[in-house]
Amino acid sequence: GVEIDVTATMDQPVKTVTTIVRGVPRGKLSSSGGDFADVRDNEILLGYPFGGGDLFNAGGLTTPVAVIQSADDAYTTLSSLDDKVRTKRIYLQPGENGYKVELIHEAEGWLDLKTLRVPTWKISHTKTPEAAYAAHYEHIRTAYHFPDYATRPDVPAWLHDTALVLTLHGQHYTGYIFNDYARQLEILRWVNTQIPGKRVLAFLSSWDGRYYWDYPNYTVNDRMGGDAGFRALVTEGQKMGFRMMPMFGMNSANKKQPGWARIADAVTHKVDGDEVDLNWVDWDNDRHQEGWLGYMNLGVPSWRNHLQGRIDEMITKYGVDAYFLDIAGGWINDTKADMHAGMRTMVNELRAKHPNVLCCGEMHYDAMLEFIPLYHSGGGARYAKDYIQRHAKFFSHLSTPAPGRGSSGVHEAGFGRFNTETLQLNATSIPTLQLVDDTFDKQRETMAAVIKQARERAGI
């Protein structure tokens, strides 16, 4: 193999350093532990993390590694041996005799470094896909100090016994209510007749009002049942043993909400200065992206203090057992502060104050496994799952089709197809049941079947 170390110095801040490697064997491509795919003559751009700051232009990497299979027993690994979260891009341009590869490292946007030392790029050759990934995953395990799930201190005892997750869909962006607080409690009472509540985590999605529109207020919603209704949902649910986990947008804030001015300085700017809107969903169905959501940076104190305060109040006031961070893996290289450091600070400070309260993220990139032990997507990549699930567990995504019509509830995906054979369950995730508006009334048999599978898997 080959290790490449570069240091670049200029009389102005260095933004990126690109290492060009020619003659890399062509073949099928795998990235971040995923399956190998024939990419034919296509040019390929991969970005770490969160698409390397361009969500729609690059394939996403949860860790900066890609593997090319050029023969049955020939694998070439392209890996960054960084120990910090910093943007990487891997670009593959096909030629007749091999790839021209660009290995791109982007400097921290908030530092303005005139001398940039590029973390080691490693190119290695192995004979099996397992060997191709082994060294990289061992590197990130030690670089980021991943604790083992079985003994990590941020996993409360009840999570080890969790056999089922219920995703209780609340209020859509439009204001349509799938399940209000009273309805959610009614569902929990029935589920408790099918499986002990103490074995179930209740994920409260859009409990706070109109999905995304009411971010970042995070207060109970009058139309959903108000303070009394939410308090009854939590306390009565907990009496049955259920663990309650409300959802918070980690980096989402509506500029039209009255408190925007107090947090406006925390809106994200990419390394070249362009402001980032969370604009990739057409919420009002006008066939055009929206511009009212700012993409926020937890590294900036105003936003971190606001969000941390809202989560802290929900824990203190209502006694919830966990909190969920939406778009947790959405790190972008900002000009003001490090999102990763800000997230870690918030999670650690909340844990210090509430040591038995769980933090859960939507999706991860590698370094997050140090301080968040549960996610609801990203745990099943073929060659990565054994490494990742040594440190964290997963359940099914909010957008997974619900029984019946396949609704994604509050999530923007709309409708999919519920698989009646698999019940949308898989071996790498905690069994998960989506509950939208008609699930409890019309899909009770399917609910019972999912719960039966969860009981059997847990030996209940």
Map each language-model feature to its residues.
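Carbohydrate-recognition beta-sandwich/jelly-roll modules
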Residues: G1-L201, E236, R243
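Active-site-adjacent "subsite" loops/lids of carbohydrate-active enzymes
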Residues: G229-T235, P246, M250-E313, K317, ...
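Aromatic- and glycine-enriched glycan-recognition loops and surfaces
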Residues: L166-V271, N305
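Conserved, mostly hydrophobic/aromatic
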Residues: L113-K114, V191, G237, L307, ...
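Active-site-proximal substrate-binding groove within the catalytic cores of carbohydrate-active enzymes
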Residues: L111-K114, V118-W121, V165-H169, Y173-T174, ...
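Active-site-proximal loop/turn and secondary-structure-junction residues that shape catalytic pockets
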Residues: S206-D208, M250-N254, A328-W331, M363-A367
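Structural preference for beta-strand elements that scaffold enzyme active sites
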Residues: A163-V165, R199-L201, G241-M245, D321-F324, ...
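Active-site groove signature of glycoside hydrolases
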Residues: V191, V200-D208, H306-T335
